[in-house]
Each structure stands twice: as C-alpha cells, then as structure tokens.
Amino acid sequence: VDNWYEVTDAVRPYNIRLFIGGHYHRNRDLRYDGIPGILMRSNLRDKDGKPGYGIYDITKDSILVYTQRIGESKKQWAAFSLAQPYYDRNGKAEKYPDFSVNTEYPNVKEQWIVQTGAGIYCSPAVEKEKVFVGDDMGYLTCYALKNGKKLWNFQSGKRIVGTPAAADGVVVFGSADRNIYGLNSKDGKLLWTVKAKSPVLGAVTIENGIAYIGASDSTFRAIDIHTGKVIWAYTGVKGYIETKPLVTADKVIFGAWDNTLYALNKADGKELWKWTGGLTRMHFSPAAVWPVAAEGKVFITDPQRAMTAINIENGETVWRTFQSMVRETIGLSEDGTRVFSKTMNDSIVCYATQGDQPCELWASN
C-alpha cells in the first residue's frame, strides 16, 4: 500500500523485533524499512499437495522460525536476534512516495475527512446530498456530502461488508447478521428487513425501485425497495456472493465464490446462462469484480490475473487474456468504448470494448 511509511515511522521508536504475517502462499523473509518481518505460509496444501503450518521457537536471545509439513520433520528457515539491533530507531523510512504530481492539479483538494473509529470495507453510496457508509462495527452512517457532518446512523447486528445503494429516499444494505435492511435515507429509520439464512456480504444495485443483492445462503434476491417484498429469489448459487451485480435492460449478472458468473432474467430471476471459463479452483472465482458491459459483451477480471470478454446473450467466451496480469478490478468509460483495470504491478491498463480479440490501447505506471 502507498502509506506503508506511516506504519514503519510510527513503530520505529519502539523495540520492534519482528513483524509477523500469515496465510500467505509461501514463506518469505522480508524487511520493512529495515525492520525484520516474515510472511508465513497458510495451512492449506502447498504445490506438492501437503498441508503444513509454522512454528516459532522463542529463546532467551532469538526467534527461530520453522515450517512443519505434515508427515515430515520440521525445517528451520529463518532466525532473528532478540539482542542485535536491526535498524536505527531514530531513523526514517528508506524512501517515501513522490507526491509532486499533486502540484499539477491544484484544483483537486480534500474537502473533508471524518474518523469513524471502525474499519471500512465497502465503498460509499451517494444519494443527492447524502453519503452512506457501512463499517466493521455494523453501523450504516449517513454524512452530509457538502461537509462530512454526521446526520444519523443505524446499527445492524454485525459488520457491513457490501456496498450499500440508495434511491427514492431508501438506502438498502446487507449485514453479516443475516439481514437485508431498507432504511429511510432522510432519518435512518427502519422501513423493512428481509431475513437470509447466512451473512449478507453482497453489494447492492438499485434500478427502478428494485434492489438486487446476493447473500451467502446460495440465494440472489430482487427486492422492492419501498415495501421490502421479495419479487424473486434465485437459489442456484453454490458459493457466497460479495460483488455488486450488473443490471442491464433484461439481465442481472454477478459472480460468486464458486468459479461461476451468473446471468439471470431480470423479470423473474430465471437462469439464462452460467460462465466458468474452465476455472477449477474456488480462489480463481470472478467473485470480487464488479462486471461491466458494452458492445454486447460482459467484461470481468479474476484472481487468475486474466481479463475476459463474454457474450452477454449466451455466456460464451469471446476472448480471455493474461497479457496485463490484472486482478479483480474493471471499469468502463462513459462512452462504452474502453475498459480499464489495474494490475498487480502498480499499473493501469486500457482495452478496447469493440472486436472479438483483446486489444490493449495503453498502459500507464
């Protein structure tokens, strides 16, 4: 992340011996501006098909780090001194980001900032002069768009992960407490609740008074935002849903953590097609990306680092490319002629939406 130096500068004066991170794909011995750190493998099966875990042996003067693969002897792969200094506690980060680009756009200025006191995992939703944000404490908070003044908040039972949506004076969101809520956007009063059987982590799309949202109970729902009535429910999903669904003139399209992109009939929720693209591992699912559509195609990116164009009528792959090593983000130009994505290597790429072959128009670091 671009603000890493804020962390290392904050902890540098203290006697930090080791940053420890886990659930990684492999073991890594790192330095964070001189401060020792490691990333430990997850306990999932590795490339040889064996699960394993990490062991830390803390002695009087050292931290010894081992990997224990099931059925084998543990192997030490790193060690750190508890006495030897690794970095200058009065020093600074090895480098800082270059913010000089900001001087080229003097009219772009921060308007306001608020401290919520809780983690925020969803994007904000805006309706007229209000901004709605969900947080890790389960609050849906409304701020004034003009100055960031807090207008009201509503507390659900658990964290809010999916991005809310607001229209016609109603704000809709899902919560990990297994409920979908409809609130009066003016004062935050509860209008209705739709109960699910599992946490609701999906983002919301509202169109023509109908909210479209997926949950973790294998169900995708269309809900009247004024009454809370479920218009239809599709129950054929095999994984949980977190994405913001794409709503077109006659289709609702979304991905789930089951290797699948779904297209449903907008009117009745019946399945029109499913796309898997030959994906076999759940972790490669097109589930986090928010799909976009243009030129008769749906465009997605996925954790396999591919960008894909899919025929919107039949779900067949038009093209799929690994050229740019993209991952889980995609955007559409206002005129629908270009799609944009960011890569794993700090770049933005642009592709044409026309044609039946991938065409990168430009890439920028």
Protein language model regions, located:
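Short loop/turn segments that connect beta-strands within beta-propeller blades
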Residues: 144-148, 184-188, 224-228, 265-269, ...
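A short C-terminal boundary segment appended to hydrolase-like catalytic domains
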Residues: 57-119, 125
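Extracytoplasmic beta-rich repeat domains
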Residues: 105-125, 151-167, 176, 190-207, ...
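Conserved beta-sheet core of the metallophosphoesterase superfamily
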Residues: 2-57
